[in-house]
Amino acid sequence: MLTLGKKALSVPILQGGMGVGVSLGGLAGAVAACGGMGCISTADAGYREPDFARDPASANHRALTAEIRKAKQIANGAGMVAINAMVATQDYAASIRTAVEAGVDAVVSGAGLPLELPGLVNTMEVAIAPIVSSGRAAKLILRRWAKEFGRTADFVVIEGCKAGGHLGFAEQDLFSGSCQTLDEILPEVLAEVKPYEVQFGHSIPVFVAGGVYTGADLAHFTRLGAAGVQLATRFITTYECDASQGYKDVLLNAGSEDVRIIHSPVGMPGRALNTPLVQAMAEGRRFPPRHCARCLKTCDPAKVPYCITHALIEAVKGNLEEGLFFCGANVGRLDRMYTVRELMDELVTEWRQNR
């Protein structure tokens, strides 16, 4: 068993949060039921609610509570149910408080430095974890948490440059291929967490993500000192994934040559499929938002090239023309549908064979 805060995992596998609506209670609960950590994305979790357009905040909080409870019911006491909360979102603090009240087991936070996270999670019963892309980021966050809140991380997630969605790397490094590898970042982060393990008297497990695809990858990184791994894209082609079958089919039909690095309205680079929307952005076209859900802290509707909320909602519905389909670098390896249990069993078997 791998202890993370007050809870434990029987399998050292985290499912990465995917918004909008890709990882909700169905997927997260199924992963947790297998002994891993399932993760619900807080990003517009209420996009299907009837009042979402009129009152997105209320819709999102109501849906987030329902999805956490759904996941916990499916898990039936196994594994852990987490949320992924993006620092860049307008509703960041409120969504975390909602999740804590709903009984979530852990809060994982990235898309910016989650410097204030311990102050938003007012109980030690809920584990907290930053997502980092360098030892420097881990050092900055852990130092701030210890000094300002007298608390440290219960675990840390390293997201490497091959991850899908928003990326914590400079665009020029992503385009040139000069980003640090996970093999290089992992020892840096392990060195940074060590003093805080001593100070707070407990281990701080480190998980790696971004390009992780097989149980052999899990074995490789655990040999290097990681506690486990996080996968996201591989979980999209599970039957339990909360996205539409149309969304899953788009990824199943994609090849590695279809992947692009984009600049997101969030203000960060991201990895996504080269869909008609992405092609239009590359041509300098603009699609002014028809309605603003006030999802991002930094978004200016008068200037933004497109509405990321609209694009991600259209994607999760399977709309290839208007959707933004985030994906990891290994999306071209997806070739079939499977259950979460089948995927988890495959990963664990490969891990045991290779460790």
What is the predicted function of each stretch?
Residues 14, 163-207, 213-355:
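Conserved active-site-proximal phosphate/metal-binding subdomains
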Residues 22, 212-213:
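Residue-level detector of alpha-helix initiation sites
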Residues 1-199:
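Active-site entrance/lid segments in N-terminal catalytic domains of soluble metabolic enzymes
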